[in-house]
């Protein structure tokens, strides 16, 4: 049995934000824009990094809490829409693969492993980031938070991603959270 044969049975699932790609600078720019539309300052980039991973709305809420700002439901919705509008138009200005990830992806591809993305980004935003970074063709499946029955940290999200990739959960590995 060759190593390639073993790898061809594997499904390697990556988290996107903070694992595969460093999206924090572009998320921060969108957050600053959204908060400025309401006459507010946003948190700094290092603080923002700890709020990433549970979706834009949660990031906005955590950011406001860090600044001791109580948001009304209307303010949250306004900030969320301003954030998304800006982010969609500017999502890969500064976003890049983390160091070593290009080599990691190529390592998996050279061994015929199936690769997939399991992310708390929406499906459309995840696909847009992958497309703009010329990564779409490396992944057999992408499952965003809005296309799963239970988003991460639920294991259901991972299981559904592996299934979408036509993999087996006992032959899958998750890289990221």
Task: Please report, for each region that a protein language model flagged, where it lies by residue.
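Active-site neighborhood of HAD-like aspartate-dependent phosphohydrolases
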Residues: 2-50
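Hydrophobic "anchor" residues on beta-strands that sit immediately upstream
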Residues: 11-13, 116, 173
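An amphipathic alpha-helix signature
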Residues: 28, 32, 45, 53-61, ...
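A metal-dependent, Asp-based hydrolase signature
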Residues: 54-89, 99, 107
């Amino acid at each position: 049995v060759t190593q390639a044969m073993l790898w061809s049975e594997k499904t390697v699932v990556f988290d996107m934000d903070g694992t595969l790609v460093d999206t924090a600078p572009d998320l921060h720019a969108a957050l600053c824009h959204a908060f400025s539309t309401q006459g507010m300052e946003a948190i700094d980039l290092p603080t923002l990094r700890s709020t990433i991973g549970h979706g834009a709305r949660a990031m906005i809420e955590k950011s406001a809490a860090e600044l001791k700002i109580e948001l009304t439901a209307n303010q949250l919705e306004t900030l969320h829409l301003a954030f998304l509008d800006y982010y969609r138009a500017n999502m890969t200005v500064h976003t890049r693969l983390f160091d070593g990830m290009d080599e990691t992806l190529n390592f998996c591809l050279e061994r015929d492993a199936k690769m997939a993305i399991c992310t708390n980004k929406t499906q459309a935003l995840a696909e847009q980031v992958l497309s703009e970074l010329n990564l779409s063709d490396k992944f057999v499946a992408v499952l965003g938070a809005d296309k799963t029955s239970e988003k991460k940290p639920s294991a259901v999200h991972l299981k559904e991603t592996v299934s979408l990739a036509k993999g087996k959960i006992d032959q899958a590995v998750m890289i990221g959270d």
